[in-house]
């Protein structure tokens, strides 16, 4: 929740996700504050996979639409966005790990940040209690990246120095998981829900819990769907 993992899509995979964020202090369903400033917004991401991370290298191409809600008739749906690429490899026989590199925004338009987000990341799958009935399947992730993973110091100084990010997620019920992460400048935590037998997933949480970043604490609601053709 709040950071990328080293896992990704493969050939014939297609995915789409929609996210909603709202200022924590203003409330979950407050779109504009008393000064008519936008304090909530939606975003969208969609793309497709190629290759095979088990046999060779897998990859995905994704497009991100930054804003779905206009501000004074400007910066509405599709006005700002990015397109990027991710390459990833699975190593099931080597501690069940995955590795990936990504450049999330080589293509930018509108008010998208001009700083490049490039990262390398490793994720490891494991079970907290492998011999128990309730195994608590887990995913541990650690990476280094620029752009959205910069420290607050780098953001204030307008530099693009690399920074460390990481997170941990655990399945606490058959269809419920909990995850927490540090994205380089903010602490995030949330729950993942998979209520159906088809790949429609939801996550609900709070980003920047400690209000360490410039955005402050925000509610986050995300839904994603993927399929193979």
Model regions and ranges:
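Transmembrane beta-barrel strands of outer-membrane/channel proteins
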Residues: 18-22, 61-67, 101-105, 140-146, ...
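Glycine-rich phosphate-binding "P-loop"
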Residues: 135-165
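A short, structural micro-pattern
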Residues: 95, 114-116, 136
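Transmembrane beta-barrel domains of Gram-negative outer membranes and organellar outer membranes
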Residues: 1-109, 127-129, 191-193
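Extracellular loop and loop/strand-boundary signature of outer-membrane beta-barrel proteins
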Residues: 107, 152-154, 209
